[in-house]
């Protein structure tokens, strides 16, 4: 008799995705981040659900309800900090996952890659709306500044912003709708992640060499299930270390002050995972130009398959491209640092140079390096 996992309509799907899936025999730890992102998402949905049971989306009580969760709810503090720091772990995994895709040329799987970019946008939107919910100073002013950027859109800008706000400023209507969206979005992300996986399984996984691995496949279980479990344990170890030893390390002290529309904090800045994009936004002295640069800094990922000029898929055997890739990583770290600094000399010029460097590397230098490598190999 055939095993039930191969015949049952539901188990068959699980079997083909996680058990009998033919996987390349040489995928490294950089291929662990997909499963880690899945774990992060499940963790965020569960902790978020329990937080939503005690949270109230009202301007007068939101801040107090978060305090109440931390002080009075059984293990509320750990749920709250797991959710807040879980978002940071989520973005660390996301950046690693995208970086892996860029390095090993995974973007040549067009459908998988494009859904991935949509997932990145959706996750960023969700995190932004979640940051508004505790209704601290940085929540309120972050929401005001970022939503206000839409007013740079010609003709419809102002109407669009007021429509999103549900009034003439960030207020009760804004908070309630952000809570509603923040609750629904993770489920949309989960659905998109399943589509992401569906498209990936149409082609099979890429591998570090970028060469077809059809001649050398191994079953996903037990080899990669055990590898994913190790990754998950390390993820939970790092997360719980953060939560139990320094839960506020990545947060902003201003968010422990209740939102006050009459008092602007001296330095308005988003969470650390948005700082690179915030630095690019601030480096352009024009409002519309800044907004366009901000959107393009992420949207440029969609162009990656078009900018791929190399005859090889992966960067494994391309030292010049490797060098430029790590310069890009260093550039993004520089932008992240600049995004958290005040707008004054010398930070302004550093931010502008780093922003120019970012687009120059992706749009010009990396495609050029690929062409040079082709010529060096007489291809």
Curated annotation (Swiss-Prot):
PROSITE patterns: CYTB_CTER, CYTB_NTER. It is found in: Mitochondrion inner membrane. InterPro entries: Cyt_b/b6_C (IPR005798), Cyt_b/b6_C_sf (IPR036150), Cyt_b/b6_N (IPR005797), Cytb/b6-like_sf (IPR027387), Cytochrome_b (IPR030689), Cytochrome_b_C_euk/bac (IPR048260), Cytochrome_b_N_euk/bac (IPR048259), Di-haem_cyt_TM (IPR016174). It is a multi-pass membrane protein. One of its GO terms (molecular function) is ubiquinol-cytochrome-c reductase activity. One of its GO terms (cellular component) is mitochondrial inner membrane. Heme b b566 binds at residues 97, 196. GO terms for biological process: mitochondrial electron transport, ubiquinol to cytochrome c. Keywords: Electron transport, Heme, Iron, Membrane, Metal-binding, Mitochondrion, Mitochondrion inner membrane, Respiratory chain, Transmembrane, Transmembrane helix, Transport, Ubiquinone. The chain crosses the membrane at residues 33-53, 77-98, 113-133, 178-198, 226-246, 288-308, 320-340, 347-367. Gene3D superfamilies: Cytochrome Bc1 Complex, Chain C. Heme b b562 binds at residues 83, 182. Its cofactor is heme b. A ubiquinone binds at residue 201. Its main location: mitochondrion. PANTHER family: CYTOCHROME B (PTHR19271:SF16). Component of the ubiquinol-cytochrome c reductase complex (complex III or cytochrome b-c1 complex) that is part of the mitochondrial respiratory chain. The b-c1 complex mediates electron transfer from ubiquinol to cytochrome c. Contributes to the generation of a proton gradient across the mitochondrial membrane that is then used for ATP synthesis. Heme 1 (or BL or b562) is low-potential and absorbs at about 562 nm, and heme 2 (or BH or b566) is high-potential and absorbs at about 566 nm. Belongs to the cytochrome b family. This is Cytochrome b. It comes from Cephalophorus niger (Black duiker).
């Amino acid at each position: 008799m055939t095993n039930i996992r191969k015949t049952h309509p539901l188990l068959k799907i699980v079997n083909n995705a996680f058990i009998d899936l033919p996987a390349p025999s040489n995928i490294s730890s950089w291929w662990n981040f997909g499963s880690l992102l899945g774990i992060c998402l499940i963790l965020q949905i569960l902790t978020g659900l329990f937080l939503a049971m005690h949270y109230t989306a009202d301007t007068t009580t939101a801040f107090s309800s978060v305090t109440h969760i931390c002080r009075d709810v059984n293990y509320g503090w750990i749920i709250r900090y797991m959710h807040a720091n879980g978002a940071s772990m989520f973005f660390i995994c996301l950046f690693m996952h995208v970086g892996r895709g860029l390095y090993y040329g995974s973007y040549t799987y067009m459908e998988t890659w494009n859904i991935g970019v949509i997932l990145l946008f959706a996750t960023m939107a969700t995190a932004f709306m979640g940051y508004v919910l505790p209704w601290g100073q940085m929540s309120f002013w972050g929401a005001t500044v970022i939503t206000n950027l839409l007013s740079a859109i010609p003709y419809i800008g102002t109407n669009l912003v007021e429509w999103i706000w549900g009034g003439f400023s960030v207020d009760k209507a804004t908070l309630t709708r952000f809570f509603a969206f923040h609750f629904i979005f993770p489920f949309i992300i989960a659905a998109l992640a399943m589509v992401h996986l569906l498209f990936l399984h149409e082609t099979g996984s890429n591998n570090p060499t970028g060469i077809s691995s059809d001649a050398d496949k191994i079953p996903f279980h037990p080899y990669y299930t055990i590898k994913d479990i190790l990754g998950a344990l390390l993820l939970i170890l790092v997360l719980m270390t953060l939560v139990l030893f320094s839960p506020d390390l990545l947060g902003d002290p201003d968010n422990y002050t209740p939102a006050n529309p009459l008092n602007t904090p001296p330095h308005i800045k988003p969470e650390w995972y948005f700082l690179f994009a915030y630095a690019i936004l601030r480096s352009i002295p024009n409002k519309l130009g800044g907004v366009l640069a901000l959107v393009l800094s992420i949207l440029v990922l969609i162009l990656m398959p078009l900018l791929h000029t190399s005859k090889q898929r992966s960067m494994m055997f391309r030292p010049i491209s490797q060098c430029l890739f790590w310069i890009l990583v260093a550039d993004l770290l520089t932008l992240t640092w600049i995004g958290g600094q005040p707008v004054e000399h010398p930070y302004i010029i550093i931010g502008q140079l780093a922003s120019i460097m970012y687009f120059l590397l992706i749009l010009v230098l990396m495609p050029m390096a690929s062409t040079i490598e082709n010529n060096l190999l007489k291809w």
